[in-house]
Amino acid sequence: MRQLTLLIILFITKIGLSQEKTPNIILMIGDGMGLTQISAGMYANNNSTALEGFEYIGLSKTYAYDQFITDSAASGTAMASGVKTYNGVLGIDSKNIPKKSILEICQEKGYNTALIATSSIAHATPAAFYAKIDSRRKYEDIALQLSEHNVNLFIGGGEMFFNKREDKRNLLDEMSDYDFVKNLDKLSES
């Protein structure tokens, strides 16, 4: 059974950015979740899900550039950057051109950004929002790219891609502007 991954991207406006309140964006992705899985969830819960309370819900076509059956890398890139790519590729279009993601665009506009994943933070779905790489399986390279991205907050697994690396670098030590914690109590103290 395929594990569903929930990824939440929070874009929080800077205080005083403008007189008008700029809306926040929260993108929740159920990795591997389609209409069939949503329907099954409804049937299992007396024809009701929390999705019904959302003001906005959207569907997108996230198939790969060259195949209708996609993987998390190609579909994540489609959601994050609005372009089709090959299965296994993150943040690079079908012509091998790196593309900006919505997370990067929001960072440029002064928003705070966050990535939260129930999987490794270097997994294809969250990585589609910050990585530009030809293989979703290059986890250590993906972790390095995250360490260079200035995401305000990230939560997820995959610590070994940051501190038990083949190149012997400890990215956690190098990321001195971040507090790294391993439980919710420590998170609230951070």
Regions found by a protein language model. Name each.
Residues 14-18:
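Sec/Tat signal peptide C-region and signal peptidase I cleavage site
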Residues 4-13:
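Sec-dependent N-terminal signal peptides
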